[in-house]
Amino acid sequence: MIKRVNKLVLGISLLFLVISITAGCDMGKEEEIKKSFEKTLSMYPIKNLEDLYDKEGYRDDQFDKNDKGTWIIGSEMATQNKGEALKVKGMVLYMNRNTRSAKGFYYVNAVKKDEDGRPQDNKIEYPVKMVDNKIIPTKDIKDGNIKKEIENFKFFAQYGTFKDLSKYKDGDISYNPEVPSYSAKYQLTNDDYNVKQLRKRYDIPTNKAPKLLLKGSGDLKGSSVGYKDIEFTFVEKKGENTFFTDSLHLEPSEDK
């Protein structure tokens, strides 16, 4: 009887030890993920995008020694009401630190599925450039609404803020060392500053508070290969979605 009790106690102790170690590993990985994103997100808000020409980013052996790199900044809003196409609007800008010039495109898309259930892309791109911190179309645009959307467009990095990532706690952590890929997901409230800013700028068809997802690939300590995105997920289910994505990272320039 005593042996059985001792075995039971030992088994319970080992179980608690495993749980403690697992929890500790998750907490450690969560802090690593936050630290990995913090290097870039701590720069937000960047009200004048031209400040990025003087901002250093992560560099590795993929960069030529004379290449200052190109910042790639993107923001995108996607909404899909039940039974409708996924409507996407966003912008990507390539900011070359060597030439101190920026070009990119504004885009709209309506993703539908064909009879076989395969998504059909209907993306339309409108080339743009940035001069004196203003986004300007480089070709004539007949659609007045699109022209106005481009003129009024602001990247999330210009108004979002992540000065204190430590306030986000107990996230849903995922890490795959084989890829490698990683993510941390947090439930937000509608009182969150960034959520208020998104609702102010976009017609978000739900009152549900979003989840914040920090997701990336590549070496957690830093890499020019891979990606780091942040996503605010308001609705995520079959045939109905609402989410906002943002990214900012430095890559080797095509023209050194």
From Swiss-Prot:
A lipid is attached at residue 25 (N-palmitoyl cysteine). GO terms for cellular component: plasma membrane. Its main location: membrane. It is found in: Cell membrane. PROSITE patterns: PROKAR_LIPOPROTEIN (PS51257). A lipid is attached at residue 25 (S-diacylglycerol cysteine). Residues 1-24 form the signal peptide. It is a lipid-anchor. Belongs to the staphylococcal tandem lipoprotein family. NCBIfam families: SA_tandem_lipo. This is Uncharacterized lipoprotein in plc 3'region.
